[in-house]
Regions:
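Core SAM-dependent methyltransferase catalytic element
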Residues: 211-227
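Conserved beta-strand signature within the Rossmann-like core of class I S-adenosyl-L-methionine
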Residues: 162-169
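Conserved class I S-adenosyl-L-methionine
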Residues: 10, 16-80
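Class I SAM-dependent methyltransferase SAM/SAH-binding core
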Residues: 81-123
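A short glycine-rich, Lys/Arg-flanked "PGG" loop and its adjoining helix->strand segment in the class I
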Residues: 149-161
Length: 227
């Protein structure tokens, strides 16, 4: 029987499903159930700890890659408590949030004043060719590797022609598994590039964060992809 991860456990496996069996239906569902329960339980402390994080580099990267003068319709995919959602709205864009954690959805609606959809990343229901940009900041790494190709195709489909996906994820050596009560996948650039291009995206560029530090002190891989 599948067991939830302990808060002090670290269990990682290679993401190559050719050599590693896929997760069963129950195991797959639990990657969301347990991860979302963690965020719901710690929503307030998460908000206090991330509210002042400066990710303006990431927001600007997306906005500067969009064609036309705007305003743009932007999906904040994994919006959390709504920090970036509010910034996009304050800049005059039509920003819509999406998160699977109910506490985050409530916080984001209250803080940003934006429409926020409560959707599990594994059970998305997105409109076709609706958004100019998708801002996936620190969110897609929670999608198990066997489901990520499908989720990336769904994000491709919800973008208008020429739309742009921004993603930023903690990078690694192509492994996935439990870190405490959160499930995550940690890719290098080559593997992430392969996944995104197979979903139909064209790479616009990438960079590592935080800026101005040696590469071994830059744990985040950010990249931009055009439909």
């Amino acid at each position: 029987m599948f067991k939830s991860a302990r808060a002090d456990s670290f269990q990682f496996h290679d993401v190559d499903t050719v050599t590693r069996p896929k997760l069963g239906d129950q195991e797959l569902a639990q990657t969301s159930v347990i991860t979302l329960a963690h965020y719901d339980q710690h929503a307030d402390s998460f908000w206090r700890g991330t509210r002042d994080h400066d990710v303006s580099q990431n927001r600007n990267a997306l906005l500067n890659s969009l064609a036309g003068p705007g305003p743009f319709r932007i999906l904040d995919f994994g919006c959390g408590p709504g920090r970036d959602l509010k910034v996009f709205r304050d800049l005059g864009h039509e920003a819509i949030g999406l998160d699977g954690a109910e506490r985050f959805v409530g916080l984001a609606r209250a803080y940003s004043g934006c429409e926020v959809w409560c959707q599990d990343f594994l059970k998305l229901d997105l409109p076709t060719e609706y958004f100019d940009g998708v801002f996936a900041n620190a969110s897609l790494f929670h999608v198990p590797s066997q489901e990520l190709p499908r989720v990336l195709r769904e994000l491709w489909a919800t973008l208008k022609p020429g739309g742009v996906l921004f993603s930023s994820n903690p990078r690694g050596e192509n492994q996935e598994g439990w870190s405490g009560e959160r499930y995550g996948c940690y890719y290098d650039l080559a593997r992430w590039r392969e996944l995104a291009t197979r979903a139909g995206f064209v790479e616009l560029g990438h960079y590592y964060r935080p800026p101005g530090l040696p590469r071994d002190q830059q744990p985040w891989l950010a990249s931009l992809w055009r439909k």
